[in-house]
């Protein structure tokens, strides 16, 4: 009986670090809607991670656009348009070349990100063993992004 308890205890101890790491990964893409402007754009609070501060900022912008396009906003104030722009089940794979180019470093996704709502000193920065994290407030130009996806025949309506 003692050996079973010892084995169970060692197993629990061995699995604890992986559970902590899995939780950290989930929080890496936390995106909250702060509000919707009269022009239909969405103000989001988003986190990005990278090997340096510039990479973390760019990743935060990519995360925000990706979430608006594919995942939809899960958290935030009422009144935010929570639905993703692309609702087709296999769109990521079907239009893989298009989205690889669109989300490339310095790609067209930046045309639909505005830093107008970013206030000086409002960004949260942190450095850890992996790299930098950067939390910032940005605006996604959702109507223009939707028009682009329609023009490129990615979405209908």
Language-model-detected regions and their locations in the chain:
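Bacterial Sec-dependent N-terminal signal peptides
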Residues: 1-25
């Amino acid at each position: 009986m003692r050996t079973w308890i010892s084995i169970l205890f060692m197993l629990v101890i061995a699995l604890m670090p992986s559970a902590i790491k899995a939780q950290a990964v989930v929080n890496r893409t936390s995106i909250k809607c702060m509000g919707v402007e009269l022009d239909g754009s969405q103000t989001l609070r988003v986190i990005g991670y990278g090997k340096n501060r510039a990479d973390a900022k760019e990743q935060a912008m990519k995360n925000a656009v990706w979430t608006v396009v594919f995942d939809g906003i899960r958290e935030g104030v009422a009144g935010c348009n929570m639905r993703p722009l692309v609702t087709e089940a296999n769109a990521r794979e079907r239009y893989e070349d298009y989205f690889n180019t669109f989300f490339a470093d310095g790609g067209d996704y930046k045309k639909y990100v505005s830093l107008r709502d970013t206030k000086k000193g409002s960004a949260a920065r942190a450095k850890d063993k992996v790299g930098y994290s950067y939390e910032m407030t940005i605006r996604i130009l959702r109507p223009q992004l939707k028009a682009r996806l329609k023009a490129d025949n990615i979405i209908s309506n």
